[in-house]
């Protein structure tokens, strides 16, 4: 905040006359928002890189954007267009040197004669823009059947059944009897809702026990449960940027929207580094003093391409340059490691499986902050953070996304805890999922159907065109009774549209063969590009580029779960 205030006071003569305490009352987000609306400061921000994505220094620019501005009256010409938004009793505390006299009034006649803004037309135009660029999203009415996993029925016609191939219930825990029974028992005893926020009637044994289970899973001192991991990421990252003095974020270019928005809401400087590019990350870290607070935000499994972040190497760089690590394991918890703690645990598999000693500190111990979800491999809903006791307590005490929302229902938390404990005790589901993933990838490769190469459980089938991706999805559903959702912009870049396939333990070889045959039929009917076509064009996303990767799960590790 102090850095933003200093920069603002240098750039704008009206802000320069305002006390730092008054400016701080606006907060990072509001100050930046107000400045962006100003024709003077808005231009300055554009020139000086306030909103740049990577490595810019707002204080290094020298363009004098105020050269032609009359400052003799001491009143901001931009602010003078608006009526007071503060109570009259607080006029002395107006920011930007505003006064009641200087603010003036909106011309009454113009306001009465103006035409009302056409809101519905505006909404329609925004929707039409989505249709025009082929990124409009259609929702399929899919009702997953617990007793027939991975089958579902469409709409209200229960006989219209399809096989679901794109759900994030990776292990089928949403219908696991242990989870369902725990939820039934808790629901019958404690009712449907939590009754309030954690501070007001919503703190209960289920939250305490779930957070203890999560902390133990990641070998951290404490954990905190949120309504979703989107909220967990947004709330935590934004708080870090607001709380740490002169904080700088370092964000992987492929980070999830929840992390991007959390960083944006934090209001601190952001540096984007090329996806999984350690040399680029180090070069950008090296520009800042070691004493500057830094947050390196990245993921373990990137869900749209299946790539895996270099966790150990990023921890090395964090130690070298004085940063903390923020690791999103949303698509990895439950899926990797002997107990399902994620990729960080999996990288020290033997240590956690058999107690083998490592020559270095375990990677899980080196990660400062974990975030994860209860809504994917664990089959429930909710998100969480895990870290040091002091860090978690700070987030608990300051993060609006935690403080001002109703607690998850007791039954949901009981089910999530049951799922975590179940997956801690067995690897059979993870091994079955990995086995089916390899089977599908191998069969598609044999037919030349392009799969983005990766070492994880994600099977991204490259199409490369939004309209064709939707057509392929529709054809799979209507002709083959197979549901695979098309993935388009903004989830993936334009031109990299794909079908995202996620095998589960329930997708046995017979269902896998049906999927492969259906994809072959669709590729022929729509004349979609195969690996050889992408190779001739120079390749894309690793397809047709000679990229080979080894699965993260080794054959030896898979054998442990088959015993």
Curated annotation (Swiss-Prot):
It is an enzyme of class 2 (transferase). GO terms for biological process: heme biosynthetic process; positive regulation of organelle assembly; protoporphyrinogen IX biosynthetic process. The modification N6-(pyridoxal phosphate)lysine is found at residue 376. InterPro entries: 4pyrrol_synth_NH2levulA_synth, Aminotrans_II_pyridoxalP_BS, Aminotransferase_I/II_large, AON_synthase_class-II, PyrdxlP-dep_Trfase, PyrdxlP-dep_Trfase_major, PyrdxlP-dep_Trfase_small. Pfam families: Aminotran_1_2. GO terms for molecular function: 5-aminolevulinate synthase activity; pyridoxal phosphate binding. The keyword Mitochondrion applies. Its EC number is 2.3.1.37. Disulfide bonds: none annotated. The active site is at 376. It catalyses: succinyl-CoA + glycine + H(+) = 5-aminolevulinate + CO2 + CoA. Gene3D superfamilies: Aspartate Aminotransferase, domain 1 (3.90.1150.10), Type I PLP-dependent aspartate aminotransferase-like (Major domain) (3.40.640.10). Its cofactor is pyridoxal 5'-phosphate. Homodimer. Belongs to the class-II pyridoxal-phosphate-dependent aminotransferase family. This is 5-aminolevulinate synthase, mitochondrial. It comes from Yarrowia lipolytica (strain CLIB 122 / E 150). The gene is HEM1.
């Amino acid at each position: 905040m102090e850095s933003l205030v200093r920069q603002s006071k240098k750039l704008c003569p009206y802000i320069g006359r305002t006390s730092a305490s008054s400016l701080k009352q606006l907060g990072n987000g509001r100050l930046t928002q107000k400045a962006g609306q100003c024709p003077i400061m808005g231009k300055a921000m554009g020139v000086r890189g306030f909103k740049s994505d990577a490595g810019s220094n707002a204080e290094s620019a020298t363009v004098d954007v105020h050269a032609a501005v009359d400052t003799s009256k001491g009143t901001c010409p931009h602010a003078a267009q608006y009526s007071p938004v503060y109570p009259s009793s607080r006029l002395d505390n107006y920011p930007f040197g505003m006064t009641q006299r200087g603010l003036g009034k909106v011309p009454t006649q113009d306001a009465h004669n103006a035409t009302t803004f056409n809101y519905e037309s505006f909404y329609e135009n925004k929707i039409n823009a989505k249709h025009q660029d082929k990124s409009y999203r259609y929702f399929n009415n899919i009702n997953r059947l617990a007793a027939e996993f991975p089958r579902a029925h469409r709409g209200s016609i229960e006989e219209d059944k399809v096989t679901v191939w794109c759900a994030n219930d990776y292990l089928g825990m949403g219908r696991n009897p242990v989870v369902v029974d725990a939820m039934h028992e808790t629901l019958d005893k404690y009712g449907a809702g939590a009754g309030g926020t954690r501070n007001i009637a919503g703190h209960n044994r289920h939250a305490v026990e779930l957070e203890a289970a999560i902390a133990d899973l990641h070998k951290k001192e404490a954990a905190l449960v949120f309504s979703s991991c989107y909220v967990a990421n947004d709330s935590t990252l934004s708080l870090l940027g607001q709380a740490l003095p002169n904080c700088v974020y370092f964000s992987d270019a492929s980070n999830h929207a929840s992390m991007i928005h959390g960083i944006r809401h934090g209001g601190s400087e952001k540096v984007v580094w090329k996806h999984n590019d350690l040399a680029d990350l180090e070069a950008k870290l090296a520009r800042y003093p070691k004493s500057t607070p830094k947050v390196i935000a990245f993921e373990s499994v990137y869900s749209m391409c299946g790539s895996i972040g270099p966790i150990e190497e990023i921890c090395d760089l964090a130690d070298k340059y004085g940063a903390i690590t923020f690791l999103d394991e949303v698509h990895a918890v439950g899926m990797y490691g002997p107990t399902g703690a994620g990729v960080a645990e999996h990288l020290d598999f033997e240590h956690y499986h058999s107690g083998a000693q490592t020559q270095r500190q375990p990677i899980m111990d080196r990660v400062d902050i974990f975030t994860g979800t209860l809504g994917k491999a664990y089959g429930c809903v909710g998100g969480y953070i895990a870290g040091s006791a002091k860090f978690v307590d700070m987030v608990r005490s300051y993060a609006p996304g935690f403080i001002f929302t109703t607690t998850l229902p007791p039954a949901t938390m009981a089910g999530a805890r049951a799922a975590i404990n179940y997956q801690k005790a067995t690897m059979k589901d993870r091994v079955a999922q990995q086995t089916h993933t390899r089977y599908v990838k191998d069969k598609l490769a044999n037919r030349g159907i392009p799969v983005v190469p990766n070492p994880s459980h994600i099977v991204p089938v490259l199409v490369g065109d939004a309209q064709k991706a939707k057509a392929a999805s529709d054809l799979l559903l209507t002709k083959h009774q197979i549901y695979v959702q098309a993935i388009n912009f903004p989830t993936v870049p334009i031109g990299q549209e794909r079908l995202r396939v996620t095998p589960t333990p329930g997708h046995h070889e017979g269902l896998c063969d049906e999927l492969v045959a259906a994809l072959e039929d669709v590729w022929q009917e729509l004349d979609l590009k195969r690996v050889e076509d992408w190779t001739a064009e120079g390749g894309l996303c690793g397809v047709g580029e000679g990229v080979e990767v080894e699965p993260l799960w080794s054959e030896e590790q898979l054998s442990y779960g088959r015993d």
